[in-house]
Design a protein with these regions (language model features):
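Non-heme Fe(II)/2-oxoglutarate
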Residues: 20-21, 25, 45, 166-175, ...
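Non-heme Fe(II)-dependent double-stranded beta-helix
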Residues: 2-123, 130-131
Length: 286
């Protein structure tokens, strides 16, 4: 549980003491920062501006919100403690064992906070249309709180990674909305994500506790319920690892904030950029 305690400390720093952590980062000379979105404030603003917008609240569009729902993308790029967890911790070896890969690259992370009563669901989506990778990616979801069925459990459509389909990227605000085709984002021939329900799909939600890791293929359709608990916070990190002969790919469906500045071109080995180091095997120079 040592790494759980380590991750818990640094996630709390990101969520509750970000300004102090950023000040320390600035002293060290780092420049790029993660992109943080307060989904609670975003949803509240949209609800007031667009009455009737089908925002993904657990108890419907008129749900009363009592807590924060926050997501930060690429937090480990500026937060050294998170980066140490993702690179030096047990996850790279776990990915190598599960996938049978002889090479694993760290790709990126997101960190999530769902406070009691925050209500906001994470709409069903795939990770693949967001990632600048050609080749398989394993996604590790790591909770630092006990996760029950009432405080934001992860849900997965079993077998959906074998559908051989890539769907349009979700806007993460409404259940079936997609990122708009603007600022260079192009959906091409990607299909619209279907409405996901337990009646129509093999949908399973997982309870979890600190020390557990849920690993999914990047093409797996997944989402998370809203936190309707009155007492239980749900914090977690999602850590992404490319494996095998995965290479950089300038994916046109990838919107901000998932378009990292790297200097790479499609086909380059990921480790050509310091952003995507080889993290397994350990003797790769990391």
């Amino acid at each position: 549980m040592e790494w759980v305690t380590f991750l818990s400390h640094h996630l709390d720093e990101v969520f509750n003491n970000r300004e102090r952590a950023m000040d320390q980062r600035e002293v060290s000379g780092e420049s790029d920062t993660g992109v943080r979105v307060d989904m609670t404030a975003l949803a509240a603003g949209l609800r007031s501006k667009v009455p009737g917008l089908p925002i993904a609240f657990e108890h419907g569009p008129d749900a009363e919100i009592a807590g924060r729902s926050v997501v930060e993308t690429d937090a480990a790029h500026w937060h050294g403690g998170l980066r140490a967890h993702h690179i030096e911790g047990p996850l790279p070896e776990l990915v190598a064992q599960l996938t049978g890969s002889t090479k694993v690259n760290y790709y990126a992370d997101q960190v999530f906070l769902k406070e009691p009563g925050s209500q906001i669901r994470t709409p069903f989506h795939q990770d693949q249309p967001y990632f600048l990778v050609d080749g398989p990616v394993a996604v590790c979801w790591v909770p630092i709180d006990v996760v029950g069925l009432d405080n934001g459990p992860m849900g997965y459509v079993r077998g959906s990674h074998r559908w051989n389909k890539v769907f349009k990227p979700s806007d993460f605000v409404t259940d079936t909305g997609t990122f708009p085709e603007e600022n260079g984002v192009e959906h091409g021939d990607l299909e619209q994500m279907p409405a996901i329900s337990a009646a129509e799909h093999d949908l399973v939600y997982f309870e979890a506790e600190p020390g557990d890791v849920i690993v999914h293929h990047w093409a797996t359709i997944h989402g998370a319920a809203g936190n309707v608990s009155t007492t239980a916070t749900r914090r977690a990190a999602s850590v992404r690892y490319a494996h095998g002969d995965s290479r950089y790919y300038q994916r046109t469906s990838s919107p901000e904030p998932f378009r990292f500045t790297t200097g790479l071109v499609s086909g380059d080995p990921l480790e050509t950029s310091d952003r995507f180091p080889i993290v397994w095997p350990r003797d790769s120079g990391v």
